[in-house]
Amino acid sequence: MFAKFRALYTSGDFIGAEKCILPVLDSKNKVPENYIAAAFNNLGVIKMRLGLYTEALGYFDKAENHTTNVKKNLKDLAFIYNNKSRIYTFRRSYSTAIEFLEKAIRIYQSLEIHDSSILHSLSTAYLNLGIIYYEMRDYSSALENLEKSARLKLNNSLPETELTFLNLAKTYAQTDSLNKAEQYFTRSLNTINKKFGGDYYRLAEVYFDYGLFLRSERRNAEALEAHSKALSICLKDYGEKHTFVALSWKHLGDDYLAQADYATALEYYQRSLIAVVNDFSNNDIYSNPSVDSSLFDIRLLDNLKSKARALELFANEQNDKALKLKTINKSLETIELALHLIDNIRNNYLTEDSRIYLSENEKETYLFAVHIASTLYSLTGDIAVKTKIYSIVQKAKSAVLRNEITENDLLYSAAIRDTTREKQNRLSGNIAAYNNLIIEESRKTSPDSTRISLWKDALFDMNREKEKITEEINREFPEYYELLQKIEPVALAGIQKHLRRDETIVDYLLSNQYNEGKRDLYILVITKDDFEFRETILDSLFSKNAGMIRNSFQHPAVNNFVEFTGPLAYIYGSLLKPVRELIAGSKLIIIPDEEIAWLPFDALLVNKPGPDQADYEGLQYLLYDYSISYCYFSSLIFNKSLLKQEGEEVLSFAPDYGLPGDHGLVADSLLGTVNELKSVYRWFRGKSFTGESATETNFRLAMQEPAIFHLAMHSISDSVNSRYSYLLFDTLNDTLEDGRLYNYEISLSKLKSPMVVLSACNSGTGTLYHGEGLMSLARGFILAGASSVIMTSWEVNDEISADIISGFYYYLSTGKHKNDALRLAKLRYLKGSSPAYSNPYYWAAYEVLGNSAPVKRNYVASGLIICALFLIAGVVLILYLRRRRIFSERLL
């Protein structure tokens, strides 16, 4: 029966193959578990080939459940994992796909390697791994795995060499090895034609990619011919409604778009939409389907993006104003459907890595949407369209952080059981910890592959357990998933309602890709009563100057006055001067994007120094004009769950690094810390943990308190993945923790703090992701629930840090907003410093991230003090009047 199934499946008769396998499951006789597992796995393969990926994954899950994890079944289990990885690859959830494949490879390598079926499965796993790395644009890793697959197949006379040849061809094409690419495409085509004939279903896959290669070589007629052949095969094998048919129509549309035949391209894109969406058959290019009934969301997303761009180009050709307006409107509607689909896809991803990958790779989609909305606004002047620009920009930025904050709020709600939440957090922490172990071991000169494999196996099991917990939460608390689906940034009116009249939000959206040497920049300016935006173009000089500024702050020893101040003035001219007249009041809230996140705005120069000036004294920094704070996205500024945080008590932690601890490091003691803490408690009450008491264990206990946290300590940054950056505590008397509080551990915590001060620890640096911003320790505390974080963007001088922090707490104690307090502290420092120390390197590192509202004082205590003073004054007055009366009576 299984042999018959294999023959039918190989021939492309998927309906016949399905009918062949169903009797195994319908049998009333007792069927062995391995037969049931094989039947479910084969049904999954059929559904995957038919483009029904959700059904396929369900069958693979059932196959796994019927396959016990014993040695005789390991081969079957690995085969199921291989198939599951393909589903996750189609969905572009690459980190999960890689995990399944690596698990399968480890299983194959543990078995009898001379078995031809195992060798074939191993070669397929390497092939699939190569495909994933190709999709991730990691072409060197793709070639490494594809060549492993090819060697196994050729050396052992294994089947399906044509698929490996195809993917080698694609990868060589991307690495400019065009002759090799052509050779492998030809080998793949010839192998399939020879073995199966010219209408074999897998031949379409080769024609897809060969056509793309031909088009990139400007061989347009040949590309059109290849894609037409692919369409013919797909229609024959799959019918009108199928993801591969949709892909065929899209490729043909792309071919006509490349030839500037926009009308024909749109016809093909419309047919592609019809093929990928159930219950949609409208050939009118001005009609769009519902995104809720697609066969495959990723395919629909690509189609909508292509159609929207073609509509814009088509509109540019039209002389009829009404038709032009209609076409631009439809382009905007189409790209908005794509954005809605991106949200749906993101919410269905299981891992943060997959969500970040989506954000990075779809950022240009959001930029195109803003561009189309801007074009429409210029044609109509419609205020509703201008407001839509704001909404699109908000969705384009920090979507992963926004989702995570909402998830945390929901997880800590009363509806989720404490045990379930604790189990999920524990698993998340263990997963991150094991990932860190693997990273650290891999960085060694001679990494232990056995230990790495052991940890990866443990990771695999933990991730599957976490998935089950997520399913349990969704099942027991359906509102959880529904609420996540409804996450929307705060509307413009809601932001303006909370803004004060002296506050202005300046929000940047910057393209991460160059287009003919240019990058698009959108600047949104939001005040209490108005909203405006500006569209501008940046060239390579912007990145060059931003890089020079960052380098000057990171390496002050090579700080050249002209090479430093020139970029500070240039960046001001690029980012703030174009919108200066739109700013209201003296408080700026900056929402950066891309490398703008590295720039300290209060150090930007309003005017370039004169040719004779050689020192920093008297320069016109933006600090003199504005109090500046920063945020990841505008909704976060007034996030209700963060605004309600209260706590005036300051809990400070200052380790003594004079002796080596269990962490194996000897760090210099932080000079000036004692004076810094004295200044804090001059204005605020609280408790100080210094030296041996500044342990990770004590901090974890203190995190449960509604207090301000002041952390005067070192941080160790991981330049590759900031999730593994950590704060360094004292370990001398800590028997429970290792003294390293990792960023991922902070993110999984729950804080009730109005402010976390990360003093002298380079806490604002991290990994920069397109669309998400900086992944830093500061971000970890925001995710944990802190209303605001006072952070540093580079290493700071301890004594100057103590001076600025002292001033900050003083002004904060008088009721000043955090951004005002920090500005006044910096101005006080500049006023009292020598010209040699007025360089921004010394004072500009500190920044306010998040809500800058004043810290709430203990009004009950203050009230009692005032009442006591009045009481004392009253007693003194009574005594004075009584003595005066007695004295008067004596005179009488």
Predicted regions and their residues:
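Conserved alpha-helical positions within TPR/SEL1-like repeat arrays
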Residues: 2-10, 35-49, 75-90, 117-135, ...
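Eukaryotic all-alpha helical interaction scaffolds
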Residues: 9, 21, 25-28, 47, ...
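Tetratricopeptide repeat
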Residues: 17, 23-24, 56, 62-63, ...
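Alpha-helical solenoid repeat scaffolds used for protein-protein interaction
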Residues: 159, 179, 183-190, 194-198, ...
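Caspase-like cysteine protease fold
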Residues: 389-391, 399, 717, 724-726, ...
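Catalytic-core domains of enzymes
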Residues: 408, 485-488, 529-534, 545-552, ...
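Catalytic cores of nucleophile-dependent amide-cleaving enzymes
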Residues: 632-634, 639, 707-803, 876
